[in-house]
């Protein structure tokens, strides 16, 4: 497979993106321009794909390697301070390059380090999950958790190069399912060619189309982000499609439900809410369900988690104001609107989902 290369405009910057297989060697082409290399890598990725990543000796003697454990618990001030301490002790200059290889949580921490150490290091992102390739590595957001609040500390900071190596996606089908919730979301937002591409594919032939799916997803998200980079005018909120319910599911399940399953189920529930109040074409619900089924994404059993438990987490959502939340819902494929939704309306949607999809 020949690598695809394109330039992604982002908030006045031009980000280079390379998509292909066995392309991590592109890192070596960049290192010579800098005083030193800070190489942050996921421990899981290193154990599974270490032979696919060029040896650090290739990058010269002034390399600082930092191995990280994946997971939300990584994103703490303590871990951030430990890394900064290493960089200070190693006298890492501002003319240094930070490269991260890993999933979304590694990218969050690495992005925050790059943005803040000496007011900014140049950064290369090598996201290793489908979710990170199509979502968290795009848009500039990074963040740390504090006092049990996710991403309460963070910046907007872009890599200048993103290397999407598709070899990382071949380790397990779970990586595909986890990311396809977001890809399905993009297909509903954009409609057209994206919806057709995702509809024509399935879990069994995903790798034949992965480069196109990743590229199309990136461009859809980037187009939305560029109209509201700092998340202030409401345009970027369209990317929350499916996520009001998904965040409630993830919180109420104590993280036991994967993000992909939560988002796919959230898309269905939110479409039910839109349909009940006359805003969503009824067939949209079945179309979302068919996509999820094609990629083997199991629907969440809402009744096992509890409607009230989910509502408790949603009621604490920072977007909830004066008893309602502005929630994006699909009026149709390719047509997203915003509804003012109360907790009662969300409760009705969750209970409708239980009746329609859990008791048949």
Curated annotation (Swiss-Prot):
Its main location: cytoplasm. GO terms for molecular function: 3-dehydroquinate synthase activity; metal ion binding; nucleotide binding. GO terms for biological process: amino acid biosynthetic process; aromatic amino acid family biosynthetic process; chorismate biosynthetic process. Binds 1 divalent metal cation per subunit. Can use either Co(2+) or Zn(2+). It comes from the Archaea. Its cofactor is NAD(+); Co(2+); Zn(2+). One of its GO terms (cellular component) is cytoplasm. Its EC number is 4.2.3.4. Keywords: Amino-acid biosynthesis, Aromatic amino acid biosynthesis, Cobalt, Cytoplasm, Lyase, Metal-binding, NAD, Nucleotide-binding, Zinc. Zn(2+) binds at residues 182, 243, 259. It is an enzyme of class 4 (lyase). NAD(+) binds at residues 70-75, 104-108, 128-129, 141, 150. InterPro entries: Dehydroquinate_synthase, DHQ_synth_AroB, DHQ_synth_fam, DHQS/DOIS_N, DHQS_C. It is found in: Cytoplasm. It catalyses: 7-phospho-2-dehydro-3-deoxy-D-arabino-heptonate = 3-dehydroquinate + phosphate. Pathway: Metabolic intermediate biosynthesis; chorismate biosynthesis; chorismate from D-erythrose 4-phosphate and phosphoenolpyruvate: step 2/7. Belongs to the sugar phosphate cyclases superfamily. Dehydroquinate synthase family. NCBIfam families: aroB (TIGR01357). Catalyzes the conversion of 3-deoxy-D-arabino-heptulosonate 7-phosphate (DAHP) to dehydroquinate (DHQ). This is 3-dehydroquinate synthase.
């Amino acid at each position: 497979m020949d690598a695809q290369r394109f330039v992604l405009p982002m908030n006045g910057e031009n980000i280079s993106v390379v998509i292909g297989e066995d392309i991590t060697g592109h890192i070596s082409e960049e290192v010579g321009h800098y005083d030193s290399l800070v190489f942050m890598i996921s421990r899981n990725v290193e154990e599974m794909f270490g032979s696919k990543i060029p040896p650090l000796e290739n990058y010269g003697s002034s390399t600082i390697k930092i191995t990280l454990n994946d997971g939300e618990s990584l994103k703490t001030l303590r871990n951030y301070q430990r890394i900064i301490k290493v960089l200070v002790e190693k006298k890492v200059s501002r003319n240094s390059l930070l490269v991260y290889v890993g999933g979304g949580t590694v990218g969050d921490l690495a992005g925050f380090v790059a943005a803040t150490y000496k007011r900014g290091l140049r950064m290369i992102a090598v996201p290793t999950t489908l979710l990170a390739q199509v979502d968290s590595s795009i848009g500039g957001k990074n963040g740390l958790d504090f006092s049990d609040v996710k991403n309460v500390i963070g910046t907007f900071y872009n890599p200048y190069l993103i290397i999407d190596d598709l070899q990382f996606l071949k380790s397990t089908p779970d990586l595909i399912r986890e990311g396809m919730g977001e890809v399905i979301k993009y297909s509903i937002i954009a409609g057209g060619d994206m919806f057709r591409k995702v509809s024509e594919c399935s879990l069994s032939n995903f790798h034949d189309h992965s480069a196109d799916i990743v590229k199309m997803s990136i461009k859809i998200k980037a187009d939305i982000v560029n109209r509201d980079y700092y998340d202030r005018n409401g345009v970027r909120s369209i990317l929350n499609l499916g996520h009001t319910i998904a965040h409630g599911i993830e919180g109420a399940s104590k993280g036991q439900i994967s993000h992909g399953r939560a988002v796919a189920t959230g898309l269905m529930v939110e479409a039910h809410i839109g349909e009940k109040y006359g805003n969503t074409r009824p067939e949209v619900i079945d179309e979302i369900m068919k996509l999820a089924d094609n990629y083997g994404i199991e629907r969440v059993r809402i009744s096992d988690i509890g409607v009230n438990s989910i509502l408790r987490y949603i009621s604490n959502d920072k977007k909830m104001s004066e008893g309602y939340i502005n929630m994006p819902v699909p009026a149709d494929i390719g047509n997203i609107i915003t509804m003012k939704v109360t907790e009662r309306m969300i409760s009705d949607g969750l209970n409708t989902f239980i009746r329609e999809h859990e008791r048949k």
